[in-house]
Amino acid sequence: SSCPGKSSWPHLVGVGGSVAKAIIERQNPNVKAVILEEGTPVTKDFRCNRVRIWVNKRGLVVSPPRIG
């Protein structure tokens, strides 16, 4: 992607959502990480300053967080 800084975090799958949020925002200060339960409807727009963290009912990351 053409967004500045780190853009994906595949190693965070299985980690707690709040831990993942802290790591992502520390590694790329340009983004705001948002924790969402899988299945939550979201907009389809692409934004360089957003990372969606998809978690299951136990709050664990279920897919690699990435910019968008």
Curated annotation (Swiss-Prot):
Keywords: Acetylation, Disulfide bond, Protease inhibitor, Serine protease inhibitor. Disulfide bonds join 3-48. It holds the Pfam family potato_inhibit. The record marks 44-45 as: Reactive bond. One of its GO terms (biological process) is response to wounding. The modification N-acetylserine is found at residue 1. GO terms for molecular function: serine-type endopeptidase inhibitor activity. It comes from the Eukaryota. Belongs to the protease inhibitor I13 (potato type I serine protease inhibitor) family. Specifically inhibits both trypsin and activated Hageman factor. This is Inhibitor of trypsin and hageman factor. It comes from Cucurbita maxima (Pumpkin). The lineage of its organism: Eukaryota, Viridiplantae, Streptophyta, Embryophyta, Tracheophyta.
